[in-house]
């Protein structure tokens, strides 16, 4: 599914302020990671990254490519490609708990300031 900024802001409201990361920071980071498209798959340095949050198959989810995956989120990677973001959010929070927001490389250079443009006016 191709989300809009406002749709995504609505769905991800529960993440606002989690571990000190604001909703506009998440929206910005997701935009620069996957363009709000749940179907995004990126192959990168022998890893494959899935979905809105670009969660990789080496550590966080399992697919048929990397064995063994640590599969910390205990989930099949293709679950991050559907429209239901519940499992994506659960895993993203685990990543944040363990790695911090810098797991998402876009965050520091692109999403740590000037965040007004990432707010949804309708909320």
From Swiss-Prot:
Protein name: Alpha-lactalbumin A
Record-linked PANTHER family: ALPHA-LACTALBUMIN, LYSOZYME C
Domain C-type lysozyme: 1-123
GO function terms (MF aspect): calcium ion binding; lactose synthase activity; lysozyme activity
Keywords: Calcium, Disulfide bond, Lactose biosynthesis, Metal-binding, Milk protein, Secreted
Annotated binding of Ca(2+), by residue: 79, 82, 84, 87-88
Quaternary state and interactors: Lactose synthase (LS) is a heterodimer of a catalytic component, beta1,4-galactosyltransferase (beta4Gal-T1) and a regulatory component, alpha-lactalbumin (LA).
BP term (GO), one: defense response to Gram-negative bacterium
GO CC annotation terms, alphabetical: extracellular region
Pfam families: Lys (PF00062)
Protein location: Secreted
Major site of localization recorded for this protein: secreted
Function recorded in the entry: Regulatory subunit of lactose synthase, changes the substrate specificity of galactosyltransferase in the mammary gland making glucose a good acceptor substrate for this enzyme. This enables LS to synthesize lactose, the major carbohydrate component of milk. In other tissues, galactosyltransferase transfers galactose onto the N-acetylglucosamine of the oligosaccharide chains in glycoproteins.
Disulfide bridges in this chain: 6-120, 28-111, 61-77, 73-91
Tissue: Mammary gland specific. Secreted in milk.
Family, as annotated: Belongs to the glycosyl hydrolase 22 family.
